[in-house]
Amino acid sequence: MFGFHKPKMYRSIEGCCICRAKSSSSRFTDSKRYEKDFQSCFGLHETRSGDICNACVLLVKRWKKLPAGSKKNWNHVVDARAGPSLKTTLKPKKVKTLSGNRMKSNQISKLQKEFKRHNSDAHSTTSSASPAQSPCYSNQSDEGSDTEMASSSNRTPVFSFLDLTYWKRQKICCGIIYKGRFGEVLIDTHLFKPCCSSKKAAAEKPEEQGPAPLPISTQEW
């Protein structure tokens, strides 16, 4: 394979008399042939002479092709490259990659710690939200279970695989459920606990009774 070919650069001690560039990829030429057009082409009020770069020569040739009566000029090019060379001004600053890698590793470690802390919190809330409790004996125990379920549901993070634009989170008497658009229900066993009211309603449901028996007459004939 061919190696990288570095383009040849031409330099001028005085620099271009128009843009003041001291280096160019093309040769510098004498400005005597173009000095008569400097005033109209570049909007100069003084005479300039010396070397001229190829870019400024092309601007003069372009100005000559303008239609008659055109007032366009390239005054913004005058002394545009005066001062430090183009190579030094466009040289990018070296970034310390070591410090950047350290910052990335610190951020990753912080994210890992936070993720572990969230997992531990979720585990503690799920373990406290589903204890083996006896049936409700008083209103006070009902209120305690409701507050416990509410606190655990608030602290438990939402599962990442749920599309919250489709599943809507709803709080009912038995805990937290996720309901879809067409009536389907998604239940998380850690956040759902049948309450006493539903159990009592199921137990107190009257059984279906058969037809009433006919009265038996005891009168003798």
Curated annotation (Swiss-Prot):
Question: Compositional bias (Basic and acidic residues) at which positions?
Answer: 111-121
What Pfam families does this protein map onto? Answer: FAM60A
The cysteines covalently paired via disulfide bonds are: none
Q: Where in the cell is it found?
A: Nucleus
**Which Gene Ontology CC terms are recorded?**
nucleus; Sin3-type complex
Q: What is the scientific name of the source organism? A: Mus musculus
Q: Where is the composition biased (Low complexity)?
A: 124-135
The protein depicted here goes by the name: SIN3-HDAC complex-associated factor
